[in-house]
């Protein structure tokens, strides 16, 4: 077991280039502007990528407009956005790397069991970035910070899938 922990930390070191303090602050400040828009974020992802919506049995085949005001949708959106918020809260501090790795590893394991592909994770990423960039003050620095942060997280995720 220790071998796997050491291997995982080596992977983190190889993949993740920690965000600078300025980058982490920029990701956190832009996320703070949208993090309470859980339903809108998930609705935007589902609208842009219906194949992602199809992976959720309770939402598959339904019009996004007809489900986005339901309690089930709000609950699920809260879980997804809550996970993103948890990861973002941990960035910018290298001592949090093991916690990030654990959370991302759990996400990978649960989604691998459901057959979720890297392509679908990349679609989610694109939908998330599209929503954030359309709803905050977005500039080259924000784009660079988000790209670096998401590259780190998705690198960990894909290594664990």
UniProtKB/Swiss-Prot annotation:
The keyword Repeat does not apply. There are at least 12 different components in Midge globin. Gene3D superfamilies: Globins (1.10.490.10). Residues 1-16 form the signal peptide. GO terms for cellular component: extracellular region; hemoglobin complex. It holds the Pfam family Globin. Belongs to the globin family. CDD domains: Mb-like. Keywords: Heme, Iron, Metal-binding, Oxygen transport, Signal, Transport. Residues 18-161 form the Globin domain. This is Globin CTT-VIIA. GO terms for molecular function: heme binding; metal ion binding; oxygen binding; oxygen carrier activity. InterPro entries: Erythrocruorin (IPR002336), Globin (IPR000971), Globin-like_sf (IPR009050), Globin/Proto (IPR012292), Mb-like_M (IPR044399). PROSITE patterns: GLOBIN. Heme b binds at residues 76, 111. Homodimer. Coiled coil: none annotated. The keyword Transport applies.
């Amino acid at each position: 077991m220790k071998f796997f922990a050491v291997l995982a930390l080596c992977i983190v070191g190889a993949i993740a280039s920690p965000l600078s303090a300025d980058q982490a602050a920029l990701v956190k400040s832009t996320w703070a502007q949208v993090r309470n828009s859980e339903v809108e974020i998930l609705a935007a992802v589902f609208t842009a990528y219906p194949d992602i919506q199809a992976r959720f049995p309770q939402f598959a085949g339904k019009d996004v407009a007809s489900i986005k005001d339901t309690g089930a949708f709000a609950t699920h959106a809260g879980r997804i956005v809550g996970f993103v918020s948890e990861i973002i809260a941990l960035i910018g501090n290298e001592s949090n790397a093991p916690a990030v790795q654990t959370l991302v590893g759990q996400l990978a394991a649960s989604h691998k069991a459901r057959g979720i592909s890297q392509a679908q994770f990349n679609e989610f990423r694109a939908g998330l970035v599209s929503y954030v960039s359309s709803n905050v003050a977005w500039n080259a620095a924000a784009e660079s910070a988000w790209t670096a942060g998401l590259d780190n997280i998705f690198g960990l995720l894909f290594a664990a899938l």
